[in-house]
Design a protein with these regions (language model features):
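Periplasmic-binding protein-like
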Residues: 68, 143-152, 239-277, 287-307
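Bilobed "Venus flytrap"/periplasmic-binding protein-like clamshell domains
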Residues: 65-88, 123, 146-214, 221, ...
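N-terminal hydrophobic or amphipathic helices and topogenic motifs
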Residues: 10, 23-105, 289-332
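Short helices/loops that flank or line small-molecule/ion binding pockets
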Residues: 104-118, 131, 165, 209-229
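Ligand-binding "clamshell"
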Residues: 128-140, 234-248
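A local structural motif
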Residues: 88-99, 191-206, 242-244, 321, ...
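Acidic, polar ligand-binding/catalytic clefts
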Residues: 108-166
Length: 332
C-alpha cells in the first residue's frame, strides 16, 4: 500500500469525511479517572477504553499517522516513509502522513477523530491520553531496552551562565506548553536549584526543541531546556559541534516519545496496528536518526509514564483541558 503525505489540516479534514466521526461522550461510564468526559476508564489503566457501543467503533479505509513536531516536520515525513508503507501493507489500509505543526494541533486532531495513529512527545503523551483518547502502546528502543532521554539546559560556549541559578533575569527559551523536557520539567525541577521559571526569568516559547537550540546558537536566547535526543541528533548530523555549546544541567531520565492509537478503533484493527509496530525493523535511515534504535517495544502507560505524570503535577500543570487551554493561550 502506498503512503500519502499531506501537510494541511484541510487535507486531513477531507480524510475525516471518509469514515471518521467525532468522539461521543461516555454517558454510561462508571469511572473515568482523570480522562475527559468523552472517555471511560473502568479498568483503571489510565487510558480510554473502547466505546461500549460497538456502533461507535471505527475501521476506516484510510489511516492517518502523525509524528510529534519536535523538529522540522518534513524531516520525519521522509524518515517514516518506509514504516508507513509497511503499515499500509500490514493493515491493507491507505496511509496518510499528517504533517502537524504543534503538539496542540496533534492532540486536537486525535480528539476530533481525524488522527488514528500518532508518535507523541513524552510530555504530550499524558495530555493526549486524557484529552484525546490516545492509547499509548509502543516506544522506540533496541535490544537493551526502551529509549530514554534527559533534559539538558544548553548555553552558548562563550556564555557566562554556569548554573541554573545564573538563569535569573536571562532570556530563556522553553519549547511548548505540553513539552516535558522543554517546559514542565523546568517548572518542576528548577525551583530546587533556586530558580522559578516565569518569576526569575520570563518564559519565551520557541515552538520546538530544534528552534530553541538554533536560537541559542544564534544568540537569540541565552539558554534553553531541551531534550537530549535533539541535542545528540544535531551533533550526529553535523548541524553543530559538541563544543559550540555547554550543557549546564542534566536531569534524570524520562521515557522518550510514545506511539498511540485512537481508543475507538475496532479491537481487531488496534491489535493489527500494534502487531505491525512490533514486527517492524527500523530502516537504516531510521536507525541512524534515532541513535541506534532499531525496533518498537511495548509500554504500559500507567507504569512507564508515572515519572512524567509526576513532573506535570509537581509543575502545577495537570493533564486537563483547562490547563491545556491556559498554557496554549500563554503561548499565543
Amino acid at each position: 500500500m502506498r503512503s500519502v503525505y499531506l501537510a494541511s489540516a484541510v487535507a486531513l479534514s477531507l480524510v475525516s469525511m471518509l469514515g471518521s466521526t467525532a468522539v461521543h461522550a461516555a454517558d454510561d461510564c462508571k469511572s473515568r479517572g482523570e480522562l475527559d468526559t468523552n472517555y471511560c476508564d473502568e479498568d483503571n489503566n489510565l487510558v480510554a477504553q473502547a466505546p461500549k457501543d460497538k456502533a461507535k467503533w471505527k475501521d476506516p479505509s484510510t489511516l492517518v499517522f502523525a509524528y510529534t513536531p519536535i523538529e522540522d516536520p518534513a524531516v520525519y515525513a521522509n524518515l517514516f516513509k518506509d514504516f508507513t508503507e509497511y503499515l499500509g501493507t500490514y493493515t491493507q489500509k491507505k496511509i496518510v502522513y499528517y504533517t502537524v505543526q504543534s503538539n496542540a494541533a496533534q492532540i486536537e486532531a486525535m480528539r476530533s477523530g481525524r488522527l488514528h495513529v500518532a508518535g507523541l512527545a513524552s510530555g504530550e503523551t499524558g495530555l493526549a491520553a486524557n484529552l484525546a483518547g490516545a492509547v499509548p502502546f509502543a516506544i522506540k528502543g533496541n535490544k537493551d531496552g526502551p529509549r530514554m532521554y534527559r533534559q539538558f539546559v544548553v548555553v552558548k560556549k562563550e556564555s557566562n551562565i554556569k548554573t541554573i541559578a545564573d538563569l535569573k533575569g536571562r532570556k530563556v527559551a522553553h519549547t511548548a506548553p505540553s513539552s516535558n523536557s522543554g517546559h514542565l520539567a523546568p517548572l518542576a525541577l528548577f525551583p530546587k536549584e533556586g530558580v522559578t521559571p516565569g518569576k526569575d526569568y520570563n518564559i519565551v516559547f520557541s515552538g520546538k526543541h530544534d528552534q530553541s537550540l538554533a536560537g541559542v546558537l544564534k544568540e537569540d536566547y541565552e539558554a534553553a531546556p531541551i531534550t537530549s535526543d535533539i541535542y545528540d541528533r544535531w551533533i550526529m548530523r553535523g548541524q553543530m559541534k559538541a563544543d559550540d555549546t555547554r550543557i549546564i544541567y542534566r536531569s534524570g531520565t524520562f521515557p522518550t516519545s510514545s506511539f498511540a492509537h485512537a481508543h475507538d478503533l475496532t479491537p481487531v484493527l488496534a491489535d493489527k496496528i500494534k502487531k505491525c509496530f512490533f514486527d517492524y525493523k527500523f530502516s537504516p535511515e531510521m536507525q541512524k536518526e534515532f541513535l541506534g534504535d532499531d525496533r518498537f517495544l511495548p509500554v504500559d502507560y500507567k507504569k512507564d509514564w508515572k515519572l512524567v505524570r509526576g513532573v506535570a503535577l509537581a509543575s502545577g500543570t495537570p493533564y486537563n483541558r483547562a490547563q491545556f487551554d491556559k498554557e496554549n493561550a500563554k503561548k499565543k
